[in-house]
A protein has these predicted regions:
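Loop/turn residues immediately N-terminal
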Residues: 1, 42-46, 88-92, 136-140, ...
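Conserved beta-propeller blade signature
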Residues: 36-38, 81-84, 130-132, 169-172, ...
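Beta-propeller domains
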Residues: 167, 173, 177, 207, ...
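Short loop/turn segments that connect beta-strands within beta-propeller blades
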Residues: 3-7, 50-54, 96-100, 143-147, ...
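Residue-level "micro-hotspots" composed of small/polar
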Residues: 9-27, 42-44, 57, 62-69, ...
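Residue-level detector of Asp-centered blade-edge/turn motifs that repeat once per structural unit
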Residues: 31-34, 74-79, 125-128, 164-167, ...
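Acidic, proline/glycine-rich low-complexity intrinsically disordered segments
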Residues: 4-16, 23-27, 34-44, 50-54, ...
Length: 340
């Protein structure tokens, strides 16, 4: 583990504190295609922050496009804007902005189409522009040209988590610890069994999952163990990163460029899959102003770096952070010899 935190930018959002009277407490982050950060402030709701102009705007006066607090914000791949899910109610909304004002483009109320859909657990968009909506009751797909949702069949495996690979293919981990490739073609949601996860114990579940650019599947279990598969997703190895999590709670797992990011409430681990170097960024570091990382306040920067937010704003870990550690070479030094 190397410690070199020179490439950290801090965004304490003083405009937000001045407007509300208390520190920023960010629960969600999402950087859109226009370099505008979508921010969900705890107990307040959706805001916008233009990084290039240091310009902040809230959405409190916009009754038509104000979802209140949200639980999910993900960038739209095919269309402009972001997909969001409000904290209360089973709705999915696509939103854009014009002159730092939020605009509602699409609004899908799941309760009008599905009986007892339950809360929305995740949103993932595939390479065809299909939005996969993972709820407590099942799996649904919103096609890019149709607001009528498609529902997975009753014999569809029960999923515990979804992710997408670099090509935009959708993968699902089932509650019985199997790996599936999912697809939606011609109004049909299908699944293909690709492997099993035998390394998990009986009561151990998959909490977080991602796929790196090599095609290897990474997962964090409910016991805090970290596993990585081979490219065929058939065999798994326990990564020696578990002890770096310590007593932290894992918030997310992301793959981007050469890195896999493991985000916890107290630290961020950046693992370079080619150099096999791991960087550690902790809230206790002097150049990180955020006290604690929160919920889903995680967003890629499209250049191999990461934005992570929480109490007192958010930080930007720039893409060159691991490269500086690459120059450090270590060789063993004998300190003791014991003869028996």
């Amino acid at each position: 583990i190397f410690f070199d935190n020179s490439k950290i930018d801090n965004y304490p959002l003083p405009q937000l504190k001045k407007h509300m009277g208390w520190d920023a407490n960010i629960l969600n982050l999402c950087l859109d295609k226009n370099d505008v950060m979508w921010v969900n402030q705890d107990r307040y709701g959706l805001c916008l922050y233009d990084l290039s102009q240091d310009l902040f705007a809230d959405n409190s006066d916009n009754n038509l496009s104000n979802p209140g607090e949200v639980s999910i914000i993900v960038k739209s791949k095919l269309k402009e804007g972001v997909w969001i899910s409000p904290r209360y109610g089973a709705r999915v909304m696509r939103m854009t902005h014009q002159d730092m004002k939020i605009q509602l483009e699409e609004d899908i109320d799941l309760e009008k189409q599905i009986h007892n859909p339950g809360n929305i657990r995740d949103l993932v968009e595939d390479n065809r522009g299909n939005l996969w909506i993972f709820t407590q009751s099942g799996l649904y797909v919103k096609r890019p040209d149709n607001s009528v949702l498609l529902a997975a069949s009753s014999d569809f495996p029960e999923m515990s988590s979804l992710t997408s690979d670099e090509e935009g293919n959708i993968w699902g981990m089932s509650t019985d610890k199997k790996v599936y490739r999912l697809s939606c073609i011609d109004r049909n949601i299908s699944y293909e069994l690709k492997g099993c996860i035998p390394v998990l114990s009986g009561q151990e579940n998959v909490n977080h999952v991602c796929i790196d650019r090599k095609g290897c599947l990474w997962l964090v279990s409910s016991l805090g163990r970290i596993f990585k598969s081979d490219t065929d997703k058939e065999t798994f190895e326990n990564m020696a990163l578990d002890n770096r999590i310590d007593d932290c709670s894992v918030l997310g797992l992301l793959a981007d460029e050469n890195n896999v990011w493991i985000i916890t409430n107290k630290k961020v681990l950046q693992y370079d899959i080619y150099q096999k170097i791991c960087m550690n960024y902790a809230t206790s570091d002097g150049n990180i102003w955020v006290d604690v990382f929160r919920y889903r306040a995680i967003s890629k920067d499209r250049q191999g770096g990461l934005y992570v937010g929480g109490h007192r704003g958010f930080i930007h870990i720039q893409s060159g952070s691991v490269l500086s550690a690459d120059k450090i070479q270590f060789s063993p030094v004998v300190t003791d010899v014991k003869i028996e």
